[in-house]
Amino acid sequence: MPSAKKRDSPSVDRRDRLTLAKLASYDDIATDALVDRAYFWTNTRKNRTKYNPMRGIVDDDVARVLLHDVIVAKDLAKAERELLAMSGLKKFMARLPNNREKDWFRRHLRKYIQMYLPDSPFEITTTNRYTITEYEAAVCARKFIKQGQEIKYLSGTLVPMTREEERDLDLKRKDFSIVMSSRKKTPSFFLGPARFANHDCNANGKLVTRGSEGMQVVATRDIYIGEEITVSYGDDYFGIDNCECLCLTCERLVRNGWAPHVPSEPQSKASTPALNDDTLSTDSHVSSKKRKFAPDSDIETSAPSTPCKRGKFVRQSSKLKSEVSFLEVATSIEQPAGPSPVCNGSDMGALGNSTVESDNDKAVDPALPSPPADSPPSTAANESERSSTSTTATSVCDAAVKIKVEETIEQSAEKVSALSEANVELPTTSLRSGSTEGDTKLELSDQPSTLKQGSIGSNRKERRKSRGKPLVVESVEAERQLVRVPGDYTKTSKLLAQTYDRWVDCHTCNAWFVQHDSYLTRRECPRCERHSMLYGYRWPKTDKEGPSDDEERVMDHRTVHRFLYPEEEALISRKDRGVSFGVTPTPELSEPRTETEGSEGCEDRRTTRASRRRTRSLRMTM
């Protein structure tokens, strides 16, 4: 009878299965060695956040193996042995615990080696359509692909995911290639060369499973040379109905993420109920998860109706000058010198109520002493604004009154807890008109203050510090969204960081690219230049096209002149460094003019007036 220890231990297949962590590490090593180190102009996104590039792998060595063993000799086994003999990959293979994991890594590495064969119809490139300032990997076709044809070597490896791995991915908030199996109804992790295929609402390819661990891309329509190979990620992958999608199809149709941003109309205060703290916190949490360029969201329509926004509006539009008569104020001030009268209970209650109401609207500490010159109008003036009649008791109160106010605002409860318990004597009362021109200040100082000068100064500093932090405004005003315009990622000044950076037109594929430190203009874009360095031909040619093809393959890329000749350089205009707003890279979109409507109208008027003057002069001479 078997022992309990053997019975409780998992099976060998379950213990040694290909997991998500293992496949992610294999893919990071393979992309680092065969994509980033193969004359690639940028680094691809890795699955592990703390991945460090391997040492012992040189770009020239990788390109030499790919050219001689893969492209010319078409010997994948020899190329695999040469690559695994490099010090970086050799050390990684030595760290693998058993032969089964070594076989998994070799099998996954072979998928990246195969995509450099001459009959491969695609290659890896980059695009900045989604983020403008950052380039992401994409798949571009370099051969014509018929509809229904399986795209050769554009494949990947599938790994089923567990509940723990799903939760781990949610916590890390990383964008992984996760596909849903239609038969098993379980999510699977998908990595390989096909993971670089981006989403498109009208995709020209689809993902098809091959066996238990394989995935292949099949063309759903004809794909032409230079066209990006895309697949569909799902209906609600980028929001509800893909409302945040930035694919090429949505760009051409100017919809979803490319739709013009229409600001919502401000709603009336009476029809919109006030939002409580729970609703406001929930909306702010939801908006933080949204992308910045999301179109019409709920947080935008509800933000202008919060009570904090109304409080700020009342404080800015105080009309003290129109409510308070300066004559009445002057007669009330001109009184014989003597002990100042004390406000009665009703007046004190009115003053306290007005103070509490204004504090709820403005979030200002009521227990602090008189505000400085840059403070807003007094709370008594706000009370006089609400009531049509202004009395002496509510607008001007004596300074020797001890007022004790209990703080009810949650935001400033911690700062004012020590001050709200003590009785503070107001030293002065200043009345200031709401107009900005010729402000009149009326001060009443009857009794000296009982507080020390140091405490008053510290209280004023605390008040200024609390007023200097616009906490309420941050919770009300939503973050400004990035409105995308079709073609805003091409020939834009956002990518020209240095003085000599400029946009250059490729002489091979006629695509615009950014050349850094363009003292001499390059002839080709990074994709076409990398292709010629690896294959020895101009893009998209990879091999001899027949027996009559006499073009020789360049085996040493250093013998090719990569810049324009002086006579060609003289024809290049360096004005504005190639920046042109509104120019789109797709021929389907009409190129809008760079002038505004007003300037076009002015040009028409200038032409019309000039033609009239010329006609009048001709009539006079005839």
UniProtKB/Swiss-Prot annotation:
It catalyses: L-lysyl(20)-[histone H4] + 3 S-adenosyl-L-methionine = N(6),N(6),N(6)-trimethyl-L-lysyl(20)-[histone H4] + 3 S-adenosyl-L-homocysteine + 3 H(+). GO terms for biological process: methylation. Residues 608-622 have a biased composition (Basic residues). Residues 262-314, 335-394, 427-470, 576-622 are annotated as: Disordered. PROSITE patterns: SAM_MT43_SUVAR420_1, SET. Keywords: Chromatin regulator, Chromosome, Methyltransferase, Nucleus, S-adenosyl-L-methionine, Transferase. Residues 376-394 have a biased composition (Low complexity). Residues 590-607 have a biased composition (Basic and acidic residues). CDD domains: SET_Suv4-20-like. It is an enzyme of class 2 (transferase). GO terms for molecular function: histone H4K20 methyltransferase activity; histone H4K20 trimethyltransferase activity. Residues 120-234 form the SET domain. It comes from the Eukaryota. SUPFAM superfamilies: SET domain (SSF82199). SMART domains: SET. PANTHER family: HISTONE-LYSINE N-METHYLTRANSFERASE KMT5B, SUPPRESSOR OF VARIEGATION 4-20-RELATED. Histone methyltransferase that trimethylates 'Lys-20' of histone H4 to form H4K20me3. This is Histone-lysine N-methyltransferase set9. It comes from Aspergillus fumigatus (strain ATCC MYA-4609 / CBS 101355 / FGSC A1100 / Af293) (Neosartorya fumigata). The lineage of its organism: Eukaryota, Fungi, Dikarya, Ascomycota, Pezizomycotina. The gene is set9.
